[in-house]
Amino acid sequence: MLGMEGMIQVLYYPNRESTIGDLNNNELAQIMMNSLINGTGANDKGIIEREDLIVLNQTKMPAIIIECGFLSNENEEKLILTDDYQNKMVDSIIDGLEEYFSLNLKD
């Protein structure tokens, strides 16, 4: 769909000592962004460190926020509402999580 590419942005909180094991928020954000861009063909709007978001800064485990698109953009809104794009997003998120945990949860 020409002109219908989405924009994906990933937000993360920098790690601190209380984070479980060696799991890394920045690494999770990078892996997820790569998986989403490759799986959906969307544009990379960036990976952004956010220390001010309680939903991220109060966790003791890896945590990110994936912004899958922006409804303020009419073309993007149409894209986000399609089953095909939603399925690509879900598959990409699953692939990214599988990659992240395969690298980080070794015995």
Q: Language-model segments: which ranges?
A:
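Active-site-proximal helix/loop segments of hydrolytic enzymes
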Residues: 1-107
